[in-house]
């Protein structure tokens, strides 16, 4: 039986009386790529922020690697790497110095931070640009640096929040290849996106999210099988079937 690594139970979060997440529950298994698929404003980012200890839920519980996020937040946090939707970079620093800085923030000594930084830059295909300032990089390259930073400290669980928004095909494919390679090494991944084709390619299971709630959860194949032939139906069709509107509305 697969080992549970992330367990979210009945998560609720509101801001100024407006519900952002209402009763979300799911389990992510160790070594799985699990997707949250939904339009902007569906509650995906709020869910990740609760899971990563940035926000405390109004109600509900989260367990990561056996640790309760609410009661053992420091222990849970050490297992997590977060690649946020917004770029978290120092543009006046080089790619290498960015990674070293964030590695030191993770508690690595100087030698370990430099070693991991070079390894992560190679992983995302930017080792030859290590000494260049990030300000000179394209949007796609900055996204790849964002991912490399999230891997500093060698987390067991990686949160990726819309990591391919607005980037070029080469960088998108590099990010996909990197994620798939990390999974082969045992990494557990939570991937949020509003691009159905990304969820279909990468994720073993997908939770379709709308209005702060999960409206369907299964493998992409099974979700598509619910409404037609999996070879002819897309996850966009599934979303339309469940909500009556397009995923991109």
Could you tell me what each predicted segment is?
Residues 158-161:
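Catalytic Walker B motif of ABC-type/P-loop ATPase nucleotide-binding domains
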Residues 100, 104, 111-129:
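Conserved ABC ATPase "signature" region
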Residues 60-71, 75-76:
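Conserved ABC transporter NBD signature motif
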Residues 154:
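Conserved catalytic motifs of ABC-family nucleotide-binding domains
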Residues 217-218:
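ABC ATPase "signature
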């Amino acid at each position: 039986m697969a080992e549970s690594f992330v367990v979210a139970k009945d998560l609720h979060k509101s801001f100024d009386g407006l519900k952002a997440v209402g009763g979300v529950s799911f389990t992510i298994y160790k070594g799985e790529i699990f997707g949250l698929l939904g339009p902007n404003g569906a509650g995906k980012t709020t869910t990740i922020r609760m899971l990563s200890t940035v926000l405390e839920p109004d109600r509900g519980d989260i367990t990561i690697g056996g640790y309760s996020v609410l009661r053992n937040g420091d222990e849970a946090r050490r297992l997590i790497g977060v690649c946020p939707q917004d770029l978290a970079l120092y543009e006046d620093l080089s790619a290498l110095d960015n990674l070293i800085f964030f590695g030191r923030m993770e508690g690595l000594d100087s030698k370990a931070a430099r070693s991991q930084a070079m390894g992560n830059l190679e992983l995302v295909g930017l080792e030859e640009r290590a000494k260049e300032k990030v300000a000179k990089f394209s949007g796609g390259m900055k996204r790849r640096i964002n991912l490399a930073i999230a891997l500093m400290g060698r987390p067991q669980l990686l949160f990726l929040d819309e990591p391919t928004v607005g980037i070029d095909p080469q960088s998108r494919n590099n990010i996909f290849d990197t994620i798939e390679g990390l999974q082969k090494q045992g990494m557990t991944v939570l991937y949020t996106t509003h691009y159905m084709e990304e969820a279909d390619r990468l994720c073993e299971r997908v939770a379709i999210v709308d209005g702060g709630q999960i409206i369907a959860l299964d493998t992409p194949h099974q979700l598509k099988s619910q409404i037609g032939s999996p070879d002819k139906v897309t996850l966009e069709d599934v979303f339309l079937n469940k909500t009556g509107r397009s995923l991109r509305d």
